[in-house]
C-alpha cells in the first residue's frame, strides 16, 4: 500500500502552564483510547506532534484509504471525540489568517531531498 505524509500546523496559547498541560495530555498513557482508535480507523498509520515555543507541527503518515472528510464526519458524530476536541481547544489557537473554525492547517511541502538528488543526479548523467 502506498503511504503519504501530511503536515499540519497549529498554535498553542503562549502560556507555560497551559503548554505543560497540553503536553501531559499527549503522553501515550493520557490520550483517550477513543482518540487513538479514531485515528487508526481513519487509515492514519502514524501521527507525531512536535512543538517549538507555542507552534505545533503535526506529521501524519496515511494510507490510500485515508479520507479526511469522512474522518471529520465520523468525528462530528462521536461525543467522545468532540469532548477531546473541546478539551484540546482550551490550549490551542488558530493560526493568523485561518478560516473561522479552522484548527490544524495543512502545510505544503516545498522541498524534498530525495527529489533534489534524483534531479541533480539525472542532470549530471
UniProtKB/Swiss-Prot annotation:
Name of this protein: L-fucose mutarotase
Membership in a protein family: Belongs to the RbsD / FucU family. FucU mutarotase subfamily.
Functional description taken from the UniProt entry: Plays a role in the catabolism of L-fucose. Involved in the anomeric conversion of L-fucose.
Keywords: Isomerase
A GO molecular-function descriptor: L-fucose mutarotase activity
Catalytic-site annotation from UniProt: 13 (proton donor)
Matches recorded under SUPFAM superfamilies: Dimeric alpha+beta barrel (SSF54909)
Pfam family, one: rhaM
Reaction(s) catalysed (UniProt annotation): alpha-L-fucose = beta-L-fucose
Activity: how regulated: Active toward L-galactopyranoside and D-arabinopyranoside but no D-fucopyranoside activity detected.
Species annotation: Xanthomonas campestris pv. campestris (strain ATCC 33913 / DSM 3586 / NCPPB 528 / LMG 568 / P 25)
Annotated EC: 5.1.3.29
